[in-house]
Amino acid sequence: MALAALSFTSCKSDLLDTNPTDQVSGDTMLKTTDGGYMALNGMIRYFWQWGQTTTGNYHQCFGPQSYNLMADLMGEDMVMSAQGSGWFWFDYLYNVKSRWNSTAWRSYDTWNYYYTIISNANYIINGKEGMTGSTEDIDYIIGNAYAFRAYSYAYCAMIFARSYIGHEDRLSIPIYTEPTFAGTAGKARSTNREVFAQAMSDINEAISLLGTKAQKHCSHFDQYVANGLKARIALYMGDYQTAHDAAAIAVKGGSFAFNKDFHYNDATDKSVLWGAEIIQAQGTTNPQFLAHMDIRYNNGGGYGGKARKCASAWLYNKMAPNDARTKWWNYETLQDNTTKGYQQWKFLFADPANTYTGADHIFMRAPEMQLIIAETACRLGNESEAKAALNELMKTRQEGYDCSSKTGTALGKLTTDETGSLLEEIILQRRIELWGEYGRVYDIKRLRQGFKRTADMGHPVAALLNNLHTDDPETFDWVLTFPSKEVDANKLILQNPTGSYPTNEDLEGDDPSKAPKTE
């Protein structure tokens, strides 16, 4: 395994270090619950710190919000109107997979990120038996570690493997559940079925340990956040009853009432189940989500102003004129002073002149859970419940909304092929509500659909992806290559294709029969 052993440090100091240091060792720190909390909070800082996972391109590498933005830009609903300073442009153009030899690009970045969290979580979990303190504190710390490991396995698999549905027994990513160190022997890729079974086992253990304990900080897991993650994982797996039941618990932890003044910069908002409050000492300027979204930052000369993030015209025009969410976008002239587009106003700094505060990170909101309830009820044949759940959400956003006339679960081959079904309507409202938050391409994968970008949607000609196969659910276009650091260190890894499909299945792909064998 390419990652080295970790030494834990306080969340008040630098992030967890992947190299041996002379600071307090992980084994020593985990002897008490005080040290356990320090280790947990140090790991959590990885959810918003930047510059820790690569040797370059730091300003597009800052944890889950950067990877969700990457995955949103890989879809069809978010338009990036210009290259700007270059950040996220190559994700948008699907021009990152061939850079797997570099430690400054996406393959290394995302792989290093998720396996660093997994390694940290393994150390914390392994420290349970030797940890002194109250049972309640120990269970809270270990429960959180299991939840973070579940999160990391699920999202890493979404990035480095094809969809779970339809590829359950194809190769995914390796599983490590014990502490690792420099020189730990690498493991072969497990299947999607095995990886998601591990993620589901972890999140169930987290839920059991957390019980009804109160969330000590909004960046931690409690029963609501853990069930929200369980709902996400189960939804991606197509386990709709499990997703439904977990979302029904999670939604009780927040509100899905619409707040027109909420611009996704305040983790204490009633809709937020999980987020991170950023204090002055932890704030930054350019390498954060809102800097890439808010056109007001740096008087329009920042990343958000140079590379505008817009809704596709197709998606915007699906909203009714009285839908309050239309205010999240404005049809205006873009940075070239010629082109017009649906510029986003959903994500804004509280004060664009002070990016060190009023720039919290949001990881999960209650409206997502309500939409999962609606979708899963529909898929399970409970249309009356599905309609009631969607109407309850939408009445806070659009006066007079009523989906009672819709029925069925048919979806088009492409995301723009309309069937008029109830399920399609639920998915549409999910696309609108969670725009910029959830990683659109993950949904495209699980729904087994394809998409085509067009200039009419607002996409630049350079981003139309005409040479790719994004209309095919079997494509590897949505699957990252493994970094060379891992492939070179772990001879059991079968590389993913750099193109849409394998050119030599003996050397690349996800066929278990082609995987390198243990010597």
Segments the model singles out, each with a brief description of its role:
Residues 11-69, 294-297, 315-320, 401, ...:
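Membrane-proximal, proline-rich intrinsically disordered regions
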Residues 21-30, 54-75, 160-169, 173, ...:
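Short, surface-exposed recognition loops and adjoining beta-strand edges that mediate ligand/DNA contacts
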Residues 33, 38, 47-58, 194, ...:
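Extended ligand-binding clefts on enzyme/binding-domain cores
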Residues 84-160, 190, 207-213, 356-361, ...:
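Conserved, well-structured interaction surfaces
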